[in-house]
């Protein structure tokens, strides 16, 4: 082969490798609970992420490059979350959708911020997460400081109980919400008889039930997740208590109904709106159902919106810092509607709703 032919061949090879590089997948870490007591919320997250990525890639991906999900399990455990965050760093991934629980998201976010990795959490609601001046942390859900007052307002204006107990699981998410509700109720001069914590993972709540009965409690707000809430409901009803219960989106899971059975009927919950009921989202709902998955979970939609937000940013830059700046300065159309963020990375104008939970695992607007 002559020199000219060799040069032409080399050029073709270089072009081929260049095109291969352009077609490389963009890896996105999706981190949540795949194991442990709240793995059902991880199921919601991964359902939303997988559908979002499938839809984004079907429409051309990011400038011709496809998104690729890399799943990580932190079990909503802070120590595991740190290990996962370090694994994400070692794997060279620059974008994270997750984590879910506030207690695991916060320590992981320290690592991501230090390493220049963008994190968009679809579920962590603790205000402390974005109150530390970090630049690379955003969320597609609201805050405890939004959800707590929503619950308190409904309790004061609609339920009007006489004797209230506030119970929490002593974790960042649950206790934070419980305190936010307590603050709102105190402002309304409600009679909060006691504020106390239980141990996450506990299954025998006979002592708590006896206390509710002794104190003539007619309303209980619980800050925490569905495994304990389900047991408390079941045991309270078995003891003959007619007490009204309320909890956050952390209890709004079909597994709650599996635990509590008919005792779950009438539970009040605060959570994001039912995005699966939005007409424009029907094609996504149908696609998820076709895979025998459940589209009703709140985190399905906040995760889908997180991927849409990342997509919008990646269409501008592949630099995590530039993506964060873009999102904080622009509105993004998502399955949740248009999303805008403040300088801290919190959504502007996010609203929680109040719903009646039913024994069949569905939720309807509370009256």
Swiss-Prot record:
Signal peptide: 1-23
Keywords assigned by UniProt, alphabetized: Amino-acid transport, Disulfide bond, Periplasm, Signal, Transport
UniProt xrefs under Pfam families: Peripla_BP_6 (PF13458)
InterPro entries listed in its UniProt record: Leu-bd, Leu_Ile_Val-bd, Peripla_BP_I
Cysteines paired by S-S bonds: 76-101
SUPFAM superfamilies for this protein: Periplasmic binding protein-like I (SSF53822)
Chief location category: periplasm
Entry's Gene Ontology BP terms: branched-chain amino acid transport; isoleucine transport; L-leucine transport; valine transport
GO CC annotations on file: ATP-binding cassette (ABC) transporter complex, substrate-binding subunit-containing; membrane; outer membrane-bounded periplasmic space
CDD domains: PBP1_ABC_LIVBP-like
Gene3D superfamilies: 3.40.50.2300
Localisation per UniProt entry: Periplasm
Superkingdom of this protein's organism: Bacteria
Reported function: This protein is a component of the leucine, isoleucine, valine, (threonine) transport system, which is one of the two periplasmic binding protein-dependent transport systems of the high-affinity transport of the branched-chain amino acids.
UniProt protein name: Leu/Ile/Val-binding protein
């Amino acid at each position: 082969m002559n020199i000219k032919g060799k040069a032409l061949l080399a050029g073709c090879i270089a072009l081929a490798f260049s095109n291969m590089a352009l077609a490389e997948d963009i890896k996105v870490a999706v981190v949540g609970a795949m194991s442990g007591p709240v793995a059902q919320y991880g199921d919601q997250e991964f359902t939303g992420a997988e559908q979002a990525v499938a839809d984004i890639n079907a429409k051309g991906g990011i400038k011709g490059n496809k998104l690729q999900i890399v799943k990580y399990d932190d079990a909503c455990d802070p120590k595991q979350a740190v290990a996962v965050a370090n694994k994400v760093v070692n794997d060279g991934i620059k974008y994270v959708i997750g984590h879910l629980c506030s207690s695991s998201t916060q320590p992981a976010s320290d690592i991501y911020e230090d390493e220049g990795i963008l994190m968009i959490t679809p579920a962590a609601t603790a205000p402390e997460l974005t109150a530390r001046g970090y630049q690379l942390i955003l969320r597609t859900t609201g805050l405890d400081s939004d959800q707590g007052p929503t619950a308190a307002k409904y309790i004061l204006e609609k339920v009007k109980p006489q004797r209230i107990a506030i119970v929490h699981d002593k974790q960042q998410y649950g206790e934070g919400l419980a305190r936010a509700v307590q603050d709102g109720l105190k402002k309304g001069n409600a009679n909060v008889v006691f504020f106390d914590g239980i141990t996450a993972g506990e299954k025998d709540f006979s002592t708590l039930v006896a206390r509710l009965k002794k104190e003539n409690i007619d309303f209980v707000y619980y800050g925490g997740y569905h495994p304990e809430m389900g047991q408390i409901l079941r045991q309270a009803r078995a003891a003959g208590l007619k007490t009204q219960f309320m909890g956050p989106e952390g209890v709004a899971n079909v597994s709650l109904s599996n635990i509590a059975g008919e005792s779950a009927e009438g539970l009040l919950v605060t959570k994001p709106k039912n995005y699966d009921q939005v007409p424009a989202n029907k094609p996504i709902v149908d696609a998820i159902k076709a895979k025998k998955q459940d589209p009703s979970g709140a985190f399905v939609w906040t995760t889908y919106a997180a991927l849409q937000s990342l997509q919008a940013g990646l269409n501008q830059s592949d630099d995590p810092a530039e993506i964060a700046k873009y999102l904080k300065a622009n509105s993004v159309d998502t399955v949740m509607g248009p999303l805008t963020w403040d300088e801290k990375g919190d959504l502007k104008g996010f609203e929680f709703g109040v719903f009646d939970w039913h024994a069949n695992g569905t939720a309807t607007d509370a009256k």
